[in-house]
């Protein structure tokens, strides 16, 4: 994405990986591992968030695909492919600004509500780079109901939370319908 903050990249990566699996591909996912310790390593379902970041663990659990983190996406990809030679497609989570990484398809995820904020680059605004970068991408995923007039094909998505997890009792979950009309705090 070209803006800072949550745009829906992680759910998009999960959806793309699972769609590729449904079509017979074997995806692997590489990520920087934001808020991890910066070491290049494989992410497993039982990995520690302080080492690999929380989003790569979620991706690993939701896709059951190999996931590797590290500051260099190229090295992460090399390690992943060495350990998992059956992987035939790589997905880079948050790799749009990682120009050293060759790519065949570029997807940009845009928050349909916030769009591009005030249109200014960091530190004055939310843009990591110019909006002109959009035109270099193959298509955009717009998170939210807002339609954007872009010069590239777009796909709209809306994230809907269906399950709540009790943080005090991790084994306890409930459906959003179970909470309808009840006070929650």
Map each language-model feature to its residues.
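Walker A (P-loop) phosphate-binding motif
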Residues: 1-45
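Short intrinsically disordered, low-complexity coil segments enriched in acidic
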Residues: 1-12, 16, 149-155, 162-164, ...
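Short, flexible coil/turn micro-motifs enriched in small/turn-prone residues
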Residues: 1-3, 48, 90, 176
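Residue-identity detector for threonine
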Residues: 3, 7-12, 26, 63, ...
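Conserved beta-strand elements of the Class I
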Residues: 26-30, 108, 185
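Phosphate/Mg2+-binding loops and adjacent switch elements
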Residues: 33-156, 163-169
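A short helix/loop element that forms part of the nucleotide-sugar donor recognition site in Leloir-type
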Residues: 169-175
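P-loop NTP-binding site
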Residues: 178-185
């Amino acid at each position: 994405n070209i803006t800072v903050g949550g745009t829906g990249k992680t759910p998009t990566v999960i959806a793309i990986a699972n769609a590729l699996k449904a079509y017979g591909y074997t995806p692997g996912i590489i990520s920087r591992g934001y808020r991890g310790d910066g070491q290049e390593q494989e992410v497993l379902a039982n990995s520690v968030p302080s080492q690999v970041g929380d989003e790569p663990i979620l991706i690993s659990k939701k896709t059951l695909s190999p996931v590797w983190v590290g500051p260099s996406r190229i090295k992460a990809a090399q390690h992943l492919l060495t350990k998992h030679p059956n992987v035939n497609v790589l997905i880079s989570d948050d790799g749009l600004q990682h120009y050293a990484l060759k790519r065949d398809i570029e997807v940009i995820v845009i928050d349909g509500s916030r769009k591009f904020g005030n249109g200014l680059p960091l530190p004055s605004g939310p843009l990591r780079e110019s909006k002109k970068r959009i035109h270099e991408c193959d298509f955009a995923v717009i998170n939210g109901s807002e339609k954007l007039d872009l010069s590239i094909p777009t796909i709209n998505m809306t994230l809907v939370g269906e399950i709540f997890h009790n943080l005090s009792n991790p084994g306890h979950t409930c459906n959003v319908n179970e909470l309808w009309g009840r006070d929650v705090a």
